[in-house]
A protein has these predicted regions:
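Flexible loop/turn segments at secondary-structure boundaries
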Residues: 29-33, 53-57, 94, 115-119, ...
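A short, acidic, amphipathic alpha-helical segment used as a generic capping/interface helix at domain edges
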Residues: 87-104, 121-122
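Acidic beta-strand-to-loop metal/phosphate-binding motif
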Residues: 105-114
Length: 168
């Protein structure tokens, strides 16, 4: 079944224009309505960096003939860090820049859960690093639920800016 699914994925198409290739960043976002709204405006999320998204699962456990429990512990300790643990060596910003390049993202939507101080403190470094790398960014702050209707206008303006930047 897995092999059949993998073959099917190779030939799969999106069924609509891709539009702007975006990445979505933040502590978490399980609001499919928000994602659908952004993509309905003419874009596609190609990668995420969330605590419970790809960051949690990034990198494999490397046994290298060693003890499995030690290998799991090393992967846990050395994985891309949550902002609250990303000190003294910062791993998250280089990881995000690598994702943007690898997935050919042209913009980033940064979702900030209100009162999540570690993520909030990371935003200036992430935003400036992405912009220096040529990505357009949109910062949206939310309080528990995503106000999809309120954010739609901002998302549309963001995508218009990206479209205009592509003209020059």
């Amino acid at each position: 079944i897995l092999e059949d699914s993998l073959k099917e994925l190779e030939n799969r198409t999106l069924g609509r224009p891709v539009g702007e290739r975006l990445m979505i960043l933040g502590s978490e976002n399980d609001d499919h309505e928000f994602i659908n709204m952004v993509e309905s405006c003419g874009s596609t999320f190609v990668i995420d960096d969330h605590c419970t998204g790809t960051r949690y699962f990034w990198d494999e456990v490397s046994l290298n003939g060693g003890d499995p429990l030690t290998a799991i512990a090393e992967r846990y300790v050395n994985r891309i860090a949550c902002p609250s643990k990303d000190w003294p060596v910062r791993t998250r910003v280089p990881h995000i820049l690598s994702l943007a390049k690898e997935w050919d993202a042209s913009g980033a939507v940064i979702l900030q859960q209100k009162f999540c101080d570690p993520h909030e403190l990371d935003i200036p470094a992430i935003k400036s690093s992405l912009e220096e790398a040529g990505l357009t960014t949109l910062f949206l702050e939310l309080d528990v639920t995503v106000p999809t209707g309120q954010f739609k206008t901002r998302v549309e303006a963001f995508l218009e800016i990206m479209e205009e930047e592509g003209l020059f």
